[in-house]
Amino acid sequence: MQPYASVSGRCLSRPDALHVIPFGRPLQAIAGRRFVRCFAKGGQPGDKKKLNVTDKLRLGNTPPTLDVLKAPRPTDAPSAIDDAPSTSGLGLGGGVASPRTLVQSNAVQVAWRRLMKELSSLPRAIAIMALIAVLSGLGTFIPQNKSIEYYLVNYPDGAEKVLGFLTGDLILTLQLDHIYTADYFYLSMGLLAASLAACTYTRQWPAVKVAQRWRFLTQPKSLLKQGRTEVLPNARVSDLGAILLQRGYQVFVKDGSLYGFKGLAGKLGPIGVHAALLLCLFGTAWSGFGTLKGNVMCPEGQDFQVASFLQPSSPIASMPASASNVIHVNKFTIDYRPDGSVAQFYSDLSLLDPAQGGKEMMRKTISVNDPFRFNGVTMYQTDWSLSAVTLRVLGQDAPLARAAQAAEAQAAASTSGPTSSASSTSDALPQQRTAFNLPMASLEGKPGVAGRLWATFLPLAEPGQDGSAPKGISILARDPQSVVFYDAKGQFVGVRRPGSGKPIEVEGLALVVEDVTGATGLELKSDPGVPAVYAGFGGLMVTTLISYLSHSQVWALQQGSSLFVSGRTNRAKLAFDRELDDILNAVPELPPTAATTVASSASTAAPAPTAKQ
């Protein structure tokens, strides 16, 4: 068997160490091994002469001499080599990997590299961030999560279009009424997360791995390529290393070569920034899919269960364990400014545990911007309302008073037995028992009503059989400070303050406003993504500062009595130049006799192996 060429000047006659690839097929890598192309006898790699035969060899981990076999011409008959069992240890099922498999594997690798390159592109990442910023701006301009009627009324079609094109139908079609939970918003965040991950994997992390290597330079010309280079006559590399250690450098010395660096955290900073941004994106997505929200208007003195008002934003949202607790509204109060407008409103709330018989677990008075947080649920003070008005009727002869007395007498007679008389019970009724608690309803948004207004009605007679409205007193209030009375004809009668004790005569009745019961408007929210978002923003601030740290490197090479020193940095280059000047000025200059000793020792020292650059 005659070889066509030799590799490294040696040849082998081991046909089992060779995989023959059919002529004309592209050169591929099998199982990560390297291939070498050998040419026919007399040919050189630079020759332009077209070769008829191409031999491809598989090299092992050691440099043995290899036989070069002539590749057979492709034929229609199956090759005996293809059917022969493999002895190469590749573990490919007893045969050589087919060219089709190699091409498919290479195509996947090429596609993966192209995908990573596209995702890690800085212009594309900026474009995705700009898209998210535009969508967020639209979400700020267009009110979110309102009713369909709201958008149809406030963004009408026709000549009154907002901005000339924005209509309610367009907003609903493009999901602009809930941008932050729209499909395209989540898709944009997913693309940004993929771009950050690809950039970290393909660019930032390899840069950190390179920065961690000890890179010794053994030739003066290698130092010249690193940037600024200085030559110190009569100097020792050990003295330079000691000074660098004092300056906070990590120093490594080997056979007259020195490598020192500091500020490696600056290389890790961009990775931390990307990780913090990914954490923010994850928290945002988790909030979108896992949030539970709800609103409740609870009157003073009443309670409600948290789980009854929490609505999940998606099927994967889970109810927190604290949702089974009960909230009791102890007191609701409002502070007013001197002009009578509302300054602040407060709700005194108690958290009760039904599993422990309604035991009070927590209690807090909340207000606007001071929420109530408990076990993953946050309760905000967002609104208020008027729930009821309590009136007292003066005089035992008033019809309403007599009706109330009769009802009390009937209840007392049914509980005290047959010997009790209604008259005696009626005589014992105190005057303050003839009181009425009338519920109030909001008239806000009704025709002819401006602002917030609550109303109730005190009937004085049964409704007529003809369907006519019953005779009664209309009672209105805009806030808990004052109550307005109108008679049966709709004529204004007067205004009274709750708790003043001053009666007002309406339709022959003397009425006293005892109290106006308020209702607190609370927004309930359980957002599991908030901790991740806060942690991401905190990490983003810290890692952004870290990324501004300079990564500085210094190389030195002892050549006789001369010391070659080079250095570079990625930031604050002027400051690094000044620092390097101070370091070089601090290196002591040796006397001639000591310099001669250093030169002789350097000349007898073994040459240092060249490190991988």
From Swiss-Prot:
Transit peptide start and end: 1-36, 37-92
Transmembrane segments: 122-142, 179-199, 269-289
Presence of keyword Nucleus: no
Pfam families according to UniProt: ResB
GO annotation (BP), single: cytochrome complex assembly
Protein's UniProt keywords contain Ribonucleoprotein: no
Subcellular location(s) per record: Plastid, Chloroplast thylakoid membrane
Positions on the Stromal side per record topology: 93-121, 200-268
A GO cellular component annotation in the UniProt record: chloroplast thylakoid membrane
Topological domain spans for side Lumenal: 143-178, 290-613
Function, as annotated: Required during biogenesis of c-type cytochromes (cytochrome c6 and cytochrome f) at the step of heme attachment.
Misc remark: Algae lacking CCS1 are unable to grow phototrophically; they specifically accumulate apocytochrome c6 and apocytochrome f. A mutant with a small stroma insert (ccs1-ac206) does not produce holocytochromes.
Subunit structure: May interact with ccsA.
Similarity comment: Belongs to the Ccs1/CcsB family.
PANTHER family listed in its UniProt record: CYTOCHROME C BIOGENESIS PROTEIN CCS1, CHLOROPLASTIC (PTHR31566:SF0)
Official protein name in the record: Cytochrome c biogenesis protein CCS1, chloroplastic
Naturally occurring in which organism (per UniProt): Chlamydomonas reinhardtii
Native organism taxonomy: Eukaryota, Viridiplantae, Chlorophyta, core chlorophytes, Chlorophyceae
